[in-house]
Amino acid sequence: MTIKIAIDCMGGDHGVSVTVPAAISFLASHDDAAVVLVGLPDAIQAQLKKLRAQDHPRVSVVPATEVITMDDPVEVALRKKKDSSMRVAVTQVKEGLAGACISAGNTGALMAVSRYVLKTLEGIERPAIATTIPNEQGWGTTVLDLGANADCEPEHLLQFARMAEAMVAVVDHKEHPTVGLLNIGEEVIKGNEVVKRAGELLRASELNFHGNVEGNDIFKGTTDIVVCDGFVGNVALKSTEGLAKMIGGMIKEEFTRSWFTKLLAGIAMPVLSRLAKRLDPARYNGASLLGLRGLVIKSHGSADAHSFEWAIKRGYDAAKNGVIERIARAFADKTSAAGAAPASPETAPTPHPSTRAA
């Protein structure tokens, strides 16, 4: 069974110098995968030649004549750059030529292009951005939305929870994962009207709802999933990234302050190495755009090759485990349970040809 991954090679701060090496490294550890490199052919081929991978049997190149920059507004991405590497890569997923698309490009453009090309699954009003944040338990907490929807209705938060539950169940192999609603306190009376109403909907749902959680619960691993609107989620994510960077810098500064602290650093190196591995941001790179009729993974724009490879792995795992099919099935089941007409074939899509037995 071959899993094909389409890669927007031109996206992000570093383009082909990161995306192509990451793709080749990924293939070295995944014999059942293939990559479709999308972008300016000359730039891609030059990188493949450097890596002596120009004849790799599991690499194909699909040309695109345009590049969406990190500063391009959504209107430009959608209306003017119709042959961008980002759009062509997403189209590979739509046409069943790839099981997932990975891009480090402009987040707003990627969401807009993906929603325009792939459309949302039946029963889902808004896609959401989800990622995993490290916690004390060691497996990470899935948090969404991280910026796609600054303003949400209570029903949207319920939908986000259902999408995340479906993803975590198949990717992390956790049936009935716990769900928490991010709030300013655990009490049901806390929060604004949207959050309080969302709590009521979650408590009445079939989900394994833990209740309200606070920001520190994300890192405790109190629940497997934490749901919030995109405004709160984005602030939480950026604050987490900033804090981690600050603490890392402070530790480095203290351990290099004198010859004695450098000696202590050498003694503590095994412990520091294990800690660095647990908190390695590269392992958590790759946010999933949930709710679409195809898999799209957003890598951090400044990712290096090691970090981008983890984003590819995230897309590979999601495609291999049938995340889209699981989400579609969850919403189709809810529609049927509510007495609606049976789901159409579009509601529960069959696996992409790229994920079937080769």
Curated annotation (Swiss-Prot):
One biological process term in Gene Ontology: fatty acid biosynthetic process
Organism name: Cupriavidus pinatubonensis (strain JMP 134 / LMG 1197)
A Pfam family matched in the record: FA_synthesis
E.C. number(s) listed in UniProt: 2.3.1.274
Its job: Catalyzes the reversible formation of acyl-phosphate (acyl-PO(4)) from acyl-[acyl-carrier-protein] (acyl-ACP). This enzyme utilizes acyl-ACP as fatty acyl donor, but not acyl-CoA.
Oligomeric form and interacting partners: Homodimer. Probably interacts with PlsY.
Gene Ontology terms: cellular component: cytoplasm
Main location group: cytoplasm
Protein name: Phosphate acyltransferase
Domain of life assignment: Bacteria
UniProt GO molecular function: phosphate:acyl-[acyl carrier protein] acyltransferase activity
Alphabetized InterPro entries for the sequence: FA_synthesis, Phospholipid_synth_PlsX-like
Stated family: Belongs to the PlsX family.
The keyword Transcription belongs to this UniProt entry's keyword annotation: no
Residue ranges of the region described as Disordered: 336-358
Keyword annotations of the record: Cytoplasm, Lipid biosynthesis, Lipid metabolism, Phospholipid biosynthesis, Phospholipid metabolism, Transferase
Location in the cell: Cytoplasm
Catalytic activity field: a fatty acyl-[ACP] + phosphate = an acyl phosphate + holo-[ACP]
Pathway info: Lipid metabolism; phospholipid metabolism
Signal peptide location: none
